[in-house]
A protein has these predicted regions:
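A conserved beta-strand element that flanks and buttresses the S-adenosyl-L-methionine
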Residues: 110
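Conserved beta-strand signature within the Rossmann-like core of class I S-adenosyl-L-methionine
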Residues: 137-144
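Short, glycine-/aromatic-enriched active-site segment of Class I SAM-dependent methyltransferases
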Residues: 146-163
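Class I SAM-dependent methyltransferase SAM/SAH-binding core
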Residues: 58-99
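Conserved class I S-adenosyl-L-methionine
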Residues: 1-43, 46-55
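A short glycine-rich, Lys/Arg-flanked "PGG" loop and its adjoining helix->strand segment in the class I
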Residues: 124-136
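Short alpha-helix
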Residues: 166-181, 187
Length: 225
C-alpha cells in the first residue's frame, strides 16, 4: 500500500507527529479529535467502523469515546504499528490489512491521511477494496492534506515518513469515490486556525468552502439496500 516502511516509525510516531505539528497547535491530540468530531457530525449513528490505515491507533480512543456502542476495527499493513496499537488499546480489535475479509461490512470506513501514501495508480483499486467492505447506506470518509495550502506542503516535505507522499486534492478524492460507485454527500476544507487563533475555530464550518484549510474531508455514501 505504501513504499514507506512504517514499522521503523511505529515506536516514535507520536513524537514525530508532535514535532511536525507543534507550530500549529501544541495539543497534538487536537488534530485527531477534530477529525473524529467531524466524522461524528457526518455519521452520528454508525454501529460499525473500520479505521482504515489506523497506524499506531491514535484515533481509536477518540472513536471509542464518540461511538461507545459501536464495533470498531483498526487495520493497517504495518505489523509494528498494529502491535503498538494493541498495546495502547488492549480492549480494541486490530486486523492486518491483508487479513481484512469482505464478509464483514462497515457503516463507516474512516481513512485519516492515508491516501497520500498510496500510489496514484492503485488508489482506485484501494477504494474498490474499501467499497466491497461497506454496508448498504454506509460511508467512506476520507481526510487528507490540502495540497493548495503552502504550510501543509512544507510540513509534508519535511516529514520523514511522508517521503513517499503524493498529495491528492479534494477534487481527485471526490472523483475517485464516485468511480467506486459512491455518492458524495459531504465535503469541505478544514483546519484553518492554529492554536494561537483558537478563538476563531467556531468559524471553521462557515469556511469549509474555502480551499485554504490545512486539510479537507470527503464523504462518499453507498446506495441503501
Amino acid at each position: 500500500m505504501t513504499s514507506i516502511d512504517f514499522d521503523q516509525y511505529a515506536r516514535d510516531y507520536a513524537s514525530l507527529i508532535a514535532e511536525q505539528t507543534e507550530a500549529f497547535d501544541s495539543d497534538n491530540d487536537y488534530f485527531v479529535r477534530y477529525k473524529v468530531d467531524r466524522l461524528q457530525s457526518i455519521a452520528p449513528h454508525a454501529r460499525s467502523i473500520l479505521d482504515f490505515g489506523c497506524g499506531v491507533g491514535r484515533s481509536i480512543p477518540f472513536l471509542r469515546a464518540a461511538y461507545p456502542q459501536a464495533e470498531i476495527i483498526g487495520s493497517d499493513p504495518s505489523a509494528e504499528s498494529l502491535a503498538f496499537a494493541r498495546k495502547t488499546n488492549p480492549k480494541e480489535t486490530f486486523v492486518p490489512l491483508n487479513e481484512l475479509g469482505a464478509e464483514t461490512r462497515y457503516d463507516v470506513i474512516f481513512a485519516a491521511c492515508v491516501f497520500h501514501h498510496i500510489a496514484p495508480e492503485i488508489r482506485d483499486e484501494t477504494l474498490a477494496f474499501c467499497r466491497e467492505r461497506l454496508a448498504p447506506g454506509g460511508r467512506i470518509v476520507i481526510f487528507e492534506h490540502n495540497p493548495l495550502n503552502p504550510v501543509t506542503q512544507r510540513l509534508v516535505n519535511t516529514c520523514p515518513f511522508d517521503a513517499d507522499a503524493v498529495l491528492l486534492g479534494k477534487g481527485e478524492t471526490a472523483a475517485r469515490l464516485k468511480r467506486a460507485g459512491l455518492e458524495i454527500d459531504k465535503s469541505g476544507y478544514c483546519l484553518f486556525f492554529p492554536g494561537a487563533l483558537a478563538a476563531l475555530r467556531p468559524l471553521e464550518r462557515r469556511l469549509q468552502w474555502l480551499p485554504l484549510g490545512g486539510q479537507y474531508f470527503v464523504s462518499g455514501k453507498s446506495p441503501a439496500a
